[in-house]
Amino acid sequence: MVAATASVTTVDGVYPSPHFEGAEKRIEIDFHANETNARGLREVTRAQLDECMAAAHCEIVSVRSNAKFDAYVLSESSLFVFPTKLVLKTCGTTNLLAGVPTILKYASQVGMESRRVKFTRSSFDKPDLQPKLHASFDDETVFLEEHFGHLSPGGGSSYILGSKLKGVQWHLYVSGSACQWQDAQPKASLEVCMTHLNREHCEKHFYRKEETFVSSAQTTTDSGIRSIFEDFAIDDYVFEPCGYSMNGLNKLSATDSQFSTIHITPEDGFSYASCELSNVDV
């Protein structure tokens, strides 16, 4: 993940360290299956996906695919494209929601219509640095209602979980009628978000080419991540000057839609890590 520098001036001329927002915004859009287009969203071209990501203020740096889906490592987190599902997860000051209209446009061009959406994020460390669409959860909800409110009778639902006085809160917006997916195979997801990371472990995720850095694959092994996801084909990336991202595709079955993804912001003072395992059969 690429660090972002905020332009800040102070009275005494002392400048704070650049801040990077590790907390991710995540949107998961399910689409109706198209009987005449089995590949569905996977028919959206790379150039079109690049345009979608540019609108969200990020870019694709790597891709790995199997029979079920395509997994993209982004400059800020990850994108997963299935025939009937798209998962976009971005951190920093990316403008995730700004990419939604372009995503829906190209989905429509390949005959795909949305049926359900789920948007989630935790509290931002520096909300004042976020783009206008993400300035507040109210702003995000207004945008989501405009684009997905019609999927539920009476509109979508938004929730804020946890107490603001006790720290981090979890923000959730969902829209889509339950009857639209009640016959689908149930899936489970686990997402763990962490702050105040161990400094010694964070050192493994700095790109120091002249000192200890060998390769992204070696970083994945040395950090212990590979041992956690031994059954996954891992696409990993270490950023300059620091930061780490990986996508994992379950390699035990070529037809498995299960994926994992990890993103680490190692800088002291605003360190952050997230680990997600999704599409696990229940």
Tell me what each language-model feature is:
Residues 1-282:
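Polybasic/polar functional segments that serve as interface/processing modules
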